[in-house]
Amino acid sequence: MGEESQAAGLPSSPPPHPLSADSSLSPADGKGTPDPSRGITRRLTFPLLSVTLLVSFGSSMLYGYNLAVVNSPAVHIKDFYNATWSQRYGHGLAPGPLTLLYSLTVSTFALGGLGGSLLVGLLVARYGRRGTLSRSSLLVLLAGGFMGFSRELGSPEMVIIGRSITGLHAGICLSVVPLYLGEIAPKNLRGFLGLMPSIFICLGVFSAQVLGLPELLGKERYWPLFLAVVVVPASLQLLLLHCFPESPRYLLIEKNDVCGATEALRRFLGMPDVQDAVQEMKEEQRSLSSVETTSVGQLLRDRAVRWQTLSVAVVNAGMQLSGIDAIWFYTNTIFENAGIPRSQIPYTTVGTGAIEVVAGLIGCFTIEKLGRRPLIITGFCAMGVCSAGITLCLLLQTALPWMRYVAVACVVGIIAGFCMGPAGVPFLMTAELFTQSHRPAAYVLGGSLNWLCNFTIGFIFPFLQMSAGAFCYLVFCGVCLLVALYVHLVVPETKNKTFVEISRTFAARRAVLPACRGATLKLRGYGALEGSLEGSGSGSGLGSGLGLGSGSELGSGLGSGSGLGLESGLGSGLGSRSGFA
């Protein structure tokens, strides 16, 4: 009755939700409107921090490690391929086929990732979020065995197969980790915890650069072990992840396990009384019973969310077409072309890796203050300018030897710009731009584009570099600047905004209907799916506002039945699926 009285404009003071950053209502205004000054900021509990660090270390970090692990031992891997080919067929490989085989080794990681991203929906529905992450660790153990014993068995195919399996694992985890963290994170910590995996991606790259030093695993005899080190974080996650609860939303809404969800909430929040959160998820469960999950095909055909869909496609494709993977895969080659002595290159790359981690930390600790748009726009602009700078440096380094050091600075700028924003914000934006019914399809679409572009860049960059020379980086410059311009013109800021407000912004751009002027009622939502409804009584048409029915979180009722149904954007139909997850 508390929510209904608020919708009717009556004063009420419901108990604050334990997870909402702004769930308290001001009793003094007499209208039940949110008062941000009286908002409740949820503290970061030890279980929340621990599980975030564990899945970031055991899953996200492996993605960064596998991106950079083929960089240092590239010469040794090519020598192994050449020697094996000579033993089998009596002659070595020509430079062209050898480059093709090595490019396949690099890019098959992305092909596996593409396959993994397509399996995410099926896996999380069957095994849950935590269960999917635990089972995916077994893939890493299998891949480590293939790559670790490849030289002993004289099989280059085992290296390629192992790389594809690690890609399969990465494709699964890049979507499941933010999904899991988003469902267990309080609203005021969603951005902070959501960018934590991107820090570990940078840390994975840094770890590969350090272990690839000649004093450690960079020697010729150690490269199979260097590739197989991934089994260590995966084993740790496999052993410890079962100590933490499954996602409460998954347990209650999808498995109808009220007791399990209650216990999980108590563990994550560190408080005994979680009945408000449980009741709220029950209301969401009842509302979702009438909502059908959208497929990728339906998502692409739905004109009501075409700008959201295009935005997710642009930022995910731009994330890879920016050339960051070319920088990570071929850092040694870039530095060698820039004139850095070969003996100094491994130490130079380690320095860039340390800067990556620092840049990731800056983005993680500033996203809740600066917002999503400034981080991603600044990051892409920095990457574009530095890509053009690399071209300029490579062209002038013969006449101006000091330009080689500017080229190194440009590489550092590209990596730092990427880690500050574009590395993690696209995954966060996918959750925030879509409602519950559209979100799984959006993750499949964004993840597929991400990995497809990853494969394309990893495969064609060596040939692009051979044909275009220094000018190949101008392609990446153009992509980065275009993505930054698109985000500036189209994508709204989503920090501290409800899904109604975000979708209303997109609806105004589509000019489907005028912006609604109803009072906003912020419900005390949980995790990444907190929503709100526009409360105005019983709407009777497009111009009269939105009718609030039973007061459930997703707005399963529409007043007298003549209000406007909402899902993932205004103007998607009258009396259709309603509310925001």
PLM region descriptions:
Residues 277-288:
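TPR/TPR-like alpha-solenoid helical repeat scaffolds
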Residues 542, 546-548, 553-560, 564-566:
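Low-complexity tandem-repeat tracts in intrinsically disordered regions
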Residues 267-277:
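Short intracellular "coupling" helices and adjacent cytoplasmic loop segments at the cytosolic face
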Residues 1-269, 286-545, 549, 569, ...:
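Alpha-helical transmembrane bundle of multi-pass membrane proteins
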